Design a protein with these regions (language model features):
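Substrate-binding pocket helix/loop in short-chain dehydrogenase/reductase
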Residues: 93-94, 101-106
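Conserved glycine-rich Rossmann-like NAD(P)H-binding loop of the short-chain dehydrogenase/reductase
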Residues: 26, 30-45
Length: 277
């Protein structure tokens, strides 16, 4: 889909990839943008810079998405491209992640995409065209050591995007799924050292570079967006020989524990001092 003169929604717009997307869309002369984030301090500044319309919403709350879609319809006359970009980190293992945390991670990293599609799709179908760009992660294709909630929800996000593309791709609805490794965003920069080391194994990309690749992929209707080319190679290994892949990840875990002894509880999913011995 050509992005020029299109009406765009971007969630998670205040920082990182979302902020960069808004700037690249503006350079591409979109007609209008609604910029969605809970952080309205940064979002208002960004909206002034790029000429977007700021909007505050909790993307994991379905009522907020319903209201967002209605707002976009009133302000822009419709939605051509919905960048469902918001996400949260969800570090922690099975034993250290509470049910409350699981629900929060699930709502933002999975249900936000589902709510967006559920409520924007009918409008797009009536228009005869539309596009969803869902931000997942390489963790959704591979896994994220020490982060059960993040791995599970990002895998679900990839799966939903794939289903959406298969089901609606021949009805004028484009879908892309963004799966980067490390990107220089506040989420990565504020993470513990071990997390930063994990996601930057193949290098940290700048958000602007990722955003430019996203726009290019939207314009050629490419489903899977992997800004780190190594991810595709890892996927081939994983699919061709899952046992080899798992053994490799187990070996990487041991190496990381040697390099970061304090990270052992997270990487081994340990919950008590006795288990640390």
């Amino acid at each position: 889909m050509e992005v020029e003169n299109k009406r765009v929604i971007i969630t998670g717009s205040a920082n990182g990839i979302g902020s960069s997307l808004s700037q690249v869309f503006r350079e591409k002369n979109v007609e209008s943008m609604v910029l969605v984030d809970l952080d309205q301090s940064n979002n208002l500044k960004l909206a002034n810079q790029v000429g977007g319309i700021p909007y505050k919403a909790d993307v994991g709350n379905e009522d907020d998405i319903i209201n967002l879609v209605e707002f976009a319809k009133q302000e822009m006359g419709g939605i051509d491209i919905f960048c469902s970009n918001a996400g949260i980190s969800g570090a922690g293992g099975l034993l250290s992640t509470s049910n409350e945390d699981w629900n929060a991670i699930w709502n933002v990293n999975v249900m936000s995409h589902i709510h967006a599609a559920k409520h924007a799709l009918p409008m797009m179908l009536d228009q005869g065209s539309g596009y969803f760009m869902n931000t997942a992660s390489a963790a959704g294709l591979l896994t994220q050591l020490g982060a059960a909630g993040y791995s599970v929800t990002k895998s679900a996000a990839v799966s939903f995007a794939e289903w959406l593309k298969i089901t609606y791709g021949e009805r004028g609805i484009g879908v892309s799924c963004l799966c980067p490794q490390g990107v220089r965003t506040p989420m990565v920069e504020d993470a513990p050292e071990i997390v930063g080391s994990l996601v930057s194994i193949d290098g940290l990309l700048e958000p602007d570079d990722v955003a430019n690749e996203v726009i290019e992929c939207i314009e050629r209707d490419q489903f899977l967006i992997t800004p780190h080319p190594e991810v595709v190679d890892y996927m081939k290994i994983k699919v061709s020989d899952p046992d080899r892949w798992i053994a490799g990840m187990q070996s990487l875990t041991k190496q990381l524990i040697e390099a970061f002894p304090d990270a052992k509880p997270m990487l081994r999913d340990l919950s008590t001092e006795e288990e640390l011995d």
